[in-house]
Amino acid sequence: MRQSKFFMPTLKEAPSDAVAKSHQLMLRGGYIRQVTAGVYAYLPLGYRVLRKAENIIEEEMNNINVPEMIMPHLLPATLWQESGRYKKYGAEMFKLQDRHGRESLLGPTHEETFTEIVAKNLKSYKQMPLALYQIQTKFRDENRPRFGLLRGREFVMLDGYSFAATREQLDEQFDDQKSAYLKIFNRAGVTVHPVIADSGTMGGKNSTEFQAPAAIGEDTIATNEKGTYAANLEMAKSIDTFKQDPEDAKELTKVATPGMDTIDKLAEFLKVPATRIVKSILYIADDQKVLVLIRGDKEINEVKLGHVLDADEVRTANADELVEITGSEKGGVGPIGADWADKIVADETVKGLYNVVVGANETDYQYQNANLDRDFKVDEFADIRTANEGELDPVDHLPLKFTTSIEVGHIFKLGTYYTKTMGADFLDNNGKAKPVIMGSYGIGVTRMLSAAVEQHLTENGIAWPKEIAPFDVHLIQMKMKDEAQTELAEKLEKELSTKYDVLYDDRNERPGVKFNDADLVGAPLRITIGRKAKDGIVEVKRPTDEKAMEVNISDLDAMITKELG
């Protein structure tokens, strides 16, 4: 490809609103251009990278015998209403009406459609296991699109779906997909950690995220140094090493605590450690009033709490509700005499505490020396706390390390979440009707490309992993009027193009302009044809090299083969 004919509008400086390095470099390098907030055009350079990533996906899916298909972008609302997700998905769904007033949506994902089109056509256990996938544009009405391709309103995604007659088949499919995904990320040069994750609005109870460590990441993952434990912070567990020595129960005492509406203030006022205080927070779970208790030095993890409560909507009570229900403003709520609570849920840290401080359900008052069972009851204990860095992991009891990361993939064991609701049954080997068992698998393809850039930054540009680089070799001719340089450059272009993707910079530009653009192209090998062309010598440089090396063209083929294969 001749660079003089290649549309690659580069920028000297990134726009001021581009915060992420990947966003800055993709704009500066002419990979993408914004059309509107969160929506981008993929210019030739960006589209080449995208297509190479898609080719890797296709090859790895073929290796596990998963065929590709395509579903429509425009979906009827009735399918999502049938599954119950039309309302649950919330404001992020793009909804529209046709001229007849029929409601539709732009697909953010396709579980319902695959259930309707595929699962409902699987009538016998003999037709399974089966898996399918597609690569297509998805739509999500992000409230704050940002970071370029990392959080957009339109994005390219691989989404795959598996169909099984037994749980054992689903487990095998899940493992096959996980293995294939790890190969995809490895080939794309993206370092990932498979981590325990929350399934969110997707449904199901078991899911794994693929998190790519990056400074700009919006997620936090918790890992140990051996790599035997990894979880999204939303789901991370840790061992609580605090132990309170047993004490005899003391007399329950009500004390005034004016203005002490935080744990720190209360602990200082009462001269007790935070571990001697039990926080009480009122949540509204659908139509239930749930009082949630946790030791004062810990924070509630609302994702974990949501799993325990298993409600469609879980939120903290607002100030008016708090006073109306409990009789107290913030800071004074507690479990003693909390007959208004439909349920009391406590974190495991509340067990084994003696003579603690709890709210008295009266503004500016607390109880001291409260004891579980004697003074208040708990309906359910569960791990609902947020893990802290440095706490011990539950596998090898090693300190947890937190890392910011980008979610680039997520796989789910959906089970019968959709097929039961939507009536997708098959006949088992005994002729009994059962719901099809499903899995769902996704890679954010455009997000993966941004993660690759974030992980392969150079001082002045990008060092693309070789399998997704837009070009394998970047030929740069220094002087276009130099006949020896032109002859050698055209010879190398012809020879190398039979095996590699070659970009030949034949522009009549200054060397500085060419080198700056080459840094943004980030090809694995840059070959410069300069003043020693007449001697058969070129300069070769990798993006991560500080200096170029001189190579005789007789040795060039062997060197390129060694580098690129």
Swiss-Prot record:
Name the catalysed reactions. tRNA(Pro) + L-proline + ATP = L-prolyl-tRNA(Pro) + AMP + diphosphate
* MF (Gene Ontology): aminoacyl-tRNA deacylase activity; ATP binding; catalytic activity, acting on a protein; proline-tRNA ligase activity; transferase activity
Q: What keywords were assigned to this record?
A: Aminoacyl-tRNA synthetase, ATP-binding, Cytoplasm, Ligase, Nucleotide-binding, Protein biosynthesis
List the InterPro entries hit by this protein, alphabetically. aa-tRNA-synt_IIb, aa-tRNA-synth_II, aa-tRNA-synth_II/BPL/LPL, Anticodon-bd, Anticodon-bd_dom_sf, Pro-tRNA-ligase_IIa, Pro-tRNA-synth_IIa_bac-type, Pro-tRNA-Synthase_IIa_type1
Places the protein is found? Cytoplasm
GO CC, sorted alphabetically, is: cytosol
Coiled-coil segments: none
Q: What class of enzyme is it?
A: ligase
Q: Which GO terms describe its biological process?
A: prolyl-tRNA aminoacylation
Origin: domain of life: Bacteria
As recorded in UniProt, its EC number(s) are 6.1.1.15
Give the function comment from the record. Answer: Catalyzes the attachment of proline to tRNA(Pro) in a two-step reaction: proline is first activated by ATP to form Pro-AMP and then transferred to the acceptor end of tRNA(Pro). As ProRS can inadvertently accommodate and process non-cognate amino acids such as alanine and cysteine, to avoid such errors it has two additional distinct editing activities against alanine. One activity is designated as 'pretransfer' editing and involves the tRNA(Pro)-independent hydrolysis of activated Ala-AMP.
What the entry says about domains is: Consists of three domains: the N-terminal catalytic domain, the editing domain and the C-terminal anticodon-binding domain.
Its assembly, as annotated, is: Homodimer.
The UniProt entry's sequence similarity note says: Belongs to the class-II aminoacyl-tRNA synthetase family. ProS type 1 subfamily.
Put simply, this protein is called Proline--tRNA ligase
By which gene is this protein encoded? proS
